[in-house]
């Protein structure tokens, strides 16, 4: 066996987690690597749509439930750790299936996007985080535009972590060209499987997903985190769904209907940026999930994967 990489891509909520699990179960030896910064946090489960225990008990999943609420996992640290794990899996004859939720981390991992190699400075970072707490996201964006407008454009709405990191690097005195590196992951082939569906159907699915999260206890999950930490500015709460619930609990969002709408719009904005980014990647093999049953989808993807592995 060579060093194959099977990647599952697509906008949030399109069905990547389910396909990855069913694909892993159909292969002789496979592990799933979750590239989703939300799922890194132990306390954030409902709003991040983590794989259920039924999945994680049957197939080894990496990078799920690895951080406490206050911890930050930089793209550089993730790329280093994930690259090491991939080498170990290949040495053991295990096929890695990468589920690309956070596209910046994914493309940094596979060497198609540069990232910061500047070590974090806790003093500077805390100062920037305090600005985020006091003035909010738009203030951070305005500050970043002054020093690095191109980087600001590439940071998705709600990604306070990357905004904070970008400003930290700027305040440390580094120019963008001095602060970046590109990973050199040693794989033989990277088969990229993309999932998509028609716009209207996808929007309906996304709204249903948000409503399910609320009914499943997202508000209570956030309340539990706040009761234990007393801090609504924690990294684990600075993500879509969680920050809106924090606003709801503060009375800034009037009712649950408005809460659902706000979370949906945040997810939709995020998804549109994901779709735009993915359309630029001409190496993705696309599958329309609306045209196939789950079983048919798995069969077609499995055929492609097995053919790829045989030639690796």
Swiss-Prot record:
Keyword terms of this UniProt record: ATP-binding, Magnesium, Nucleotide-binding, Transferase, tRNA processing
Site residues (Interaction with substrate tRNA), renumbered to this chain: 102, 125
Cofactors that this protein relies on: Mg(2+)
Chain's role: Catalyzes the transfer of a dimethylallyl group onto the adenine at position 37 in tRNAs that read codons beginning with uridine, leading to the formation of N6-(dimethylallyl)adenosine (i(6)A).
GO terms, biological process: tRNA modification
Keyword ATP-binding: yes
Subunit and partners: Monomer.
Chain sites annotated for binding ATP: 10-17
EC code: 2.5.1.75
Protein name from the UniProt record: tRNA dimethylallyltransferase
Enzyme class: transferase
Keyword Magnesium attributed: yes
Family according to the record: Belongs to the IPP transferase family.
Binding-site positions, substrate: 12-17
Reactions the enzyme catalyzes: adenosine(37) in tRNA + dimethylallyl diphosphate = N(6)-dimethylallyladenosine(37) in tRNA + diphosphate
GO molecular function: ATP binding; tRNA dimethylallyltransferase activity
Top-level division of the source organism's lineage: Bacteria
Record-linked HAMAP family: IPP_trans
């Amino acid at each position: 066996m060579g060093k194959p990489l099977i990647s599952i891509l697509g906008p949030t909520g399109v069905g990547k987690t389910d396909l990855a699990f069913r694909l892993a179960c159909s292969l002789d030896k496979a592990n799933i690597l979750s590239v989703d910064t939300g799922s890194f946090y132990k306390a954030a489960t409902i709003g991040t749509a983590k794989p259920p225990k039924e999945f994680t008990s049957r197939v080894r999943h990496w990078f799920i439930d690895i951080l406490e609420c206050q911890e930050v996992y930089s793209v550089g640290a993730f790329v280093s750790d994930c690259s090491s794990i991939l080498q170990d899996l290949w040495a053991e004859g295990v096929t890695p299936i990468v589920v690309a939720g956070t596209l910046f981390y994914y493309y940094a991992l596979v060497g198609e996007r540069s990232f910061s190699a500047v070590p974090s400075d806790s003093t500077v970072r805390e100062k920037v985080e305090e600005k985020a707490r006091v003035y909010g996201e738009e203030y951070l964006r305005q500050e970043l535009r002054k020093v690095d407008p191109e980087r600001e454009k590439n940071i998705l709405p709600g990604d306070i972590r990357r905004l904070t990191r970008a400003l930290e690097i700027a305040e440390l005195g580094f120019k963008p060209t001095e602060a970046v590196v590109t990973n050199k992951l040693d794989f033989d082939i990277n088969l990229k499987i993309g999932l998509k569906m028609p716009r209207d159907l996808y929007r309906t699915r996304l709204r249903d997903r948000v409503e399910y999260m609320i009914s499943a206890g997202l508000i209570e999950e956030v309340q539990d985190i706040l009761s234990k930490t007393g801090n609504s500015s924690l990294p684990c709460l600075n993500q879509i769904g969680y920050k809106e619930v924090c606003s709801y609990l503060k009375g800034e969002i009037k009712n649950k209907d408005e809460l659902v709408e706000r979370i949906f719009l945040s997810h939709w904005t995020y998804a549109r940026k994901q779709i735009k980014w993915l359309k630029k990647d001409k190496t993705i093999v696309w599958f329309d999930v609306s045209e196939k049953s789950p079983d048919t989808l798995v069969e077609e993807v499995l055929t492609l994967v097995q053919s790829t592995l045989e030639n690796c």
